Amino acid sequence: MKRDLYETLGVARNADEKELKSAFRKLAMQYHPDRNPGDQEAEKSFKEINQAYETLKDPQKRAAYDRYGHAAFEQGGMGAGFGNGFAGGSAGGTSRHFRRHLRRDDGRRSSAPLLGRSRTRCGPSLQHGDHPRGGLFRQDGADPRADVGHLRRLHGLGREAGHQPEDLRHLPGLRPYPRRPGLLLDRTHLPDLRRSRSDDHRSLQQMPWPGPGHRGAHAVGQYSDRHRGRHAYPPLRRGRTGLRGGPPGDLYIFLSVRPHEFYQRDGADLYCSVPISMTTATLGGKFDVTTLDGTKSRVTVPEGTQAGKQFRLKGKGMHGRALQPDGRPLYPDPDRDAAEAHQAPARIAAGVRADLVQGEQSAIDGLLLPHERFLRYTERIATPGFRLCPSP
């Protein structure tokens, strides 16, 4: 398989003329036959470098290569619009005939001529599991964030390891041109569909369909995967490269917030459950809640507070440009930890009150242990360097 011309020169696909010339001069001096007498490999590399530079420095040849790859310069290939393979025929008239028998890369019939005036197409949006053929590679309505699975093993080779590419020109849907006597089309042929586009991993790849067990039919589509990194927002024009020289698509990022061990989020509001003792719920008292910034806010519990009672701390919730300037509220929810659910009495006798105070101080019944664990947690998250959402 022929080597990618950009890879041969060691430049990016969007390299300008100055970068191409600089890379060519550097490699030409390195592999020049005069500097490597008798070295056949150096001579071969020198010829490849010259061929790559001669192709890419010409705007028309470069555009044809970007669209069709090496097939643009082969006899009867997609680049035959430059005059090869038609024996004086009109590329425009021939393209109208091609249009009736070929489909676009996304499975729909093309409204633009295939040769000569091929229109560009915006690249597909880079979503996990998204392909130009839509329902061909996944069921309609499926979550685009679902794993691609089998497609991960292809790595742009167009086939699984250990399997040779197959001749696909006889398959249904890949209709060759009708061979009618007297037509110039007899002198043309489809591009070699046996060739997997490993020379251009960024756009076209051949992938098995309908599944891992069927290696007979292939189709041209896009392959996407998950990537982790920092991205500017909004992430526009960061998708796959467009087909036939078109602009790149958009990049869509799906965000999911991992659950926190203490806070529960509902929009911009935060909720948390705070364990308190039966004595505090019955007699009243106070407890501290650690907020997102590590500071503590004291909540006063009135006498006779029942389980599930919500308290509101104004301005202690989420902050952001789209939220209120002082933040949204934080709702501590007292959760009395006891062996059995019970209600705190609204009124209590003086003697019982004294017994409860004594039990609060001694903690014989162990009801204070959950609250003590909560206090230790709040002290831990208030220490410098603690992160509420540690990196995975």
UniProtKB/Swiss-Prot annotation:
* InterPro entries per the UniProt record, alphabetical: DnaJ_C, DnaJ_domain, DnaJ_domain_CS, HSP40/DnaJ_pept-bd, J_dom_sf
Which residue ranges does the record annotate as region Disordered?
Answer: 103-142, 157-244
Q: Where is the signal peptide?
A: none
J domain mapped to chain residues: 2-71
Q: Which PROSITE patterns does the record match to this protein? A: DNAJ_1, DNAJ_2
For bias type Low complexity, the affected ranges are 171-185
Feature: compositional bias, Basic residues: 227-241
- Locations of Basic and acidic residues compositional bias? 157-170, 186-203
Q: Name one GO cellular component term.
A: cytoplasm
Organism domain of life? Bacteria
Q: What is this protein called?
A: Protein NolC
Which taxonomic lineage is given here? Bacteria, Pseudomonadati, Pseudomonadota, Alphaproteobacteria, Hyphomicrobiales
